[in-house]
Amino acid sequence: MTTQSQGGGLLHRLAQGSLVKQILVGLVLGILLAWLSKPAAIAVGLLGTLFVGALKAVAPVLVLMLVMASIANHKHGQKTNIRPILWLYLLGTFSAALTAVLFSFLFPSTLHLVAGATDITPPTGIVGVLRDLLLSMVANPIDALLKGNYIGILVWAVGLGFALRHGNDTTKNLVNDMSDAVTFMVKLVIRFAPIGIFGLVASTLATTGFDTLWGYAQLLMVLIGCMFLVALVINPLIVFAKIRRNPYPLVFACLRESGVTAFFTRSSAANIPVNMALCEKLNLDRDTYSVSIPLGATINMAGAAITITVLTLAAVHTLGIAVDVPTALLLSVVASLCACGASGVAGGSLLLIPLACNMFGIPNDIAMQVVAVGFIIGVLQDSCETALNSSTDVLFTAAACQAEDARLASHALRN
């Protein structure tokens, strides 16, 4: 009996304990296992695969139900903050691209070009990217759920939500209950994050190591340094301009609870449930974050803008092409537009590099070699990119919600 109660007490402590501390323990154990036994580390990679698979499985249903329930139960006259969040997303992405241009000129990198992959096809132009985004809006809803097409899911969720506004209260309550049930499943999956990250870290270190990355040390330093600058300086400045108080407690909370998980899952879509849970913890408006978080996972791509810009300018420096200031500014705009469409392209930000390279007349075969370099450094580049993208979704959502709360409180005091 005593053993059972002790076991129950241990499980209770694990279930109610700090998730961040448990993730750090999983991280350390994963590194140790990869160091001690590569075969065992590769074997436990299944735990990471299962965790990421569970997150990807629950995320589309979560987005559909939350957005649908939010709009169906939206009261007339009740205000959401989607527009200011959209502006923050766009400003953050463009600022990241500008920062990447500045870093690339201050610390010019060159590439050891390798054979590019021939079995992947990049988009043919920005028009092609925008066309793919528009087509994803009219996707079959079942197909959108199966493939994780969040633009299509959002369109259907918004449409069904507006249609259900005219339904009776029983129907609306059912939608709310379904939303709560999916949220419960999400919380259950997130509790397994320490085990999942343990498996991901162990298998990644065991299979790839970091030996191949040393040849691209400077390029990685420019990429990661730029992402750190955006996360710790540029984004806090944008948030400060919005909320008019110290932004760093909010910034560090988002990096700690969203960025860490996103770093290891390397998937903005898989991190949507984590971000939703963090928004709830921050007591943000559910009607707002249920739309802004999946939307951010689709279009808020500061990390992708940095990757596209830095790798393109590295190719430019390698080939000795001169770049003036207006062209660099135009590259920032192009990289921002490409980044916003990265979620609709198989291969993400890397396969949009040929679009940016095309601005400088770089042939497609060389551009695809740059893409191949991107895949080589992807272990770190993609992890940092996803961590920046996903944590910024919560950061800007929280900033807009808190600014609106402060405005309403100030208005109430004046009256």
Swiss-Prot record:
UniProt keywords, alphabetically: Amino-acid transport, Cell inner membrane, Cell membrane, Membrane, Symport, Transmembrane, Transmembrane helix, Transport
InterPro entries membership: Na-dicarboxylate_symporter, Na:dicarbo_symporter_sf, Ser_Thr_transp_SstT
Keyword Transport: yes
Record field: transmembrane: 23-43, 47-67, 85-105, 144-164, 181-201, 220-240, 303-323, 333-353
Keyword Metal-binding applies: no
NCBIfam families xrefs: PRK13628.1 (NF010151)
Protein's name according to its UniProt entry: Serine/threonine transporter SstT
Species assigned in the record: Cronobacter sakazakii (strain ATCC BAA-894) (Enterobacter sakazakii)
Recorded name of the encoding gene: sstT
